[in-house]
Amino acid sequence: VTLIRHEEEAAAGLDFGSIATTVMLRLGEKTQPAALPEGLYGRLLGHSEEAWLTDEFLSEQLDASTCYSVMEMFGDEPEKWRGVLQDGHIYAPRSLTALLNKPSRSLYYDLKWSDENYALRCLRLFLKQVMLQTSLAALLSGAPALSWRVSMPGALPPYRQEAYLEMVRGLAREVAKETGMPLSARFPAVLYALENQADGWYFLSRSEVDARGGDLNLDIGGSTADLSLWLGGKNHAAAESSLLL
């Protein structure tokens, strides 16, 4: 029997990166990883503790809120890639050695920047699996509803930013319908910001910078470096840049 306490609505912050993706949950003033409890990393086959469903499907770290932005697909026909965990899954290797020994033909990455049809199909399944797992984590944390926060680097072409936002909005509705975890009625289902804005607002809200003076934020990712200057406690950057690496 699992007792679920009633908490405030959850906001999920989804940081989708070129190499790895991290998701955190905020419930009121509490922030925590969007991780699943140990019992849900159980056994698929057999009844012994040796038959864990961790190999490549789920991270061995029970509190992990970060995964590689890599999909393993079970077939080579992209038009048939429709179902999460049925046609492909987020690849979670046990070790770097396991990753190096994995046949590369079944692994798909560069999901953030590629315009290819197969990559966009992979991206949709990747984001849906992340959002399904996050919704379950929010439910088990006692949240009655959920909203999403996402960001993208300014260096990403505007049409790609818009396409990404529309994909997340559609998936938010789809995941809410499939899981029964409702979207928030108090906040927009999906809020979007450029990564420079998201970084600056985060540090201002945490009171980790000198609001009377200024601070310089540098966010180095797998494909971009986002730089912004914040002065006088204002809620917008005085200057900013997003550079491709």
Locations of the language-model features?
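Short helix-terminating capping/connector loops at secondary-structure junctions
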Residues: 6-7, 138-145, 180-187, 209-212
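Generic recognition of stable, solvent-exposed alpha-helical segments in well-folded globular domains
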Residues: 16, 118, 122-125, 159-163, ...
